[in-house]
Design a protein with these regions (language model features):
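Hydrophobic membrane-embedded alpha-helices
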Residues: 1-167
Length: 167
């Protein structure tokens, strides 16, 4: 929520100096946030996970992507490669990370880079078409609601069953 309050104000203030300055400022803030995230993760991973300054870089790479900083592959083959690599990075994060993986730390780069490459690839790639199928769109529409409700449901079930759940 803090991002959606501060980012428009930052855009309002900085964009009047031109796109190049905007990209540089956003890039500098993203880099500082990433370095801070890695540093804070070593000290207190909960603080790094929950506090906005240490996660702002994740939002800002999306903003920089929207501003075209990372360019776009011109050919369908290039966009397909981007989306396949992105999907593989996200899948690797899901399969390799466990409860012992330091996170966010530098490990957050893997799924964030994957998401960036996947978005950069576009919807007209085979991966984009796969992710646009009905069942996956259904899951996508539900995912944020499930994310918001999963913890209260786990706590309720744990309380109702009176036995800890192995997560």
């Amino acid at each position: 929520e803090q991002f959606y309050l501060t980012f428009p104000l930052l855009l309002l203030f900085v964009s009047k100096y031109g796109r190049d300055i905007l990209v540089r400022v956003l890039g500098a803030i993203a880099l500082l946030s990433l370095v801070g995230c890695i540093w804070m993760s070593a000290l207190d991973s909960s603080t790094a996970f929950y506090l906005f300054p240490f996660r702002a870089w994740e939002f800002l790479i999306g903003a920089l992507l929207a501003l075209g900083l990372f360019g776009s592959a011109r050919t369908l083959q290039g966009r397909t490669a981007s989306s396949v690599i992105g999907l593989l990075l996200i899948a690797a994060s899901v399969m390799v990370f466990d409860d012992m993986t330091p996170f966010p730390a530098a490990n957050a780069l893997l799924p964030c880079a994957g998401a960036m490459l996947l978005i950069r690839g576009g919807a007209d790639t085979p991966v984009g078409r796969l992710l646009s199928t009905g069942p996956l769109r259904f899951v996508g529409r539900l995912s944020y609601s499930v994310y918001l409700w999963h913890w209260p449901l786990i706590v309720f079930v744990n309380y109702a069953v009176i036995m800890p759940l192995a997560l």
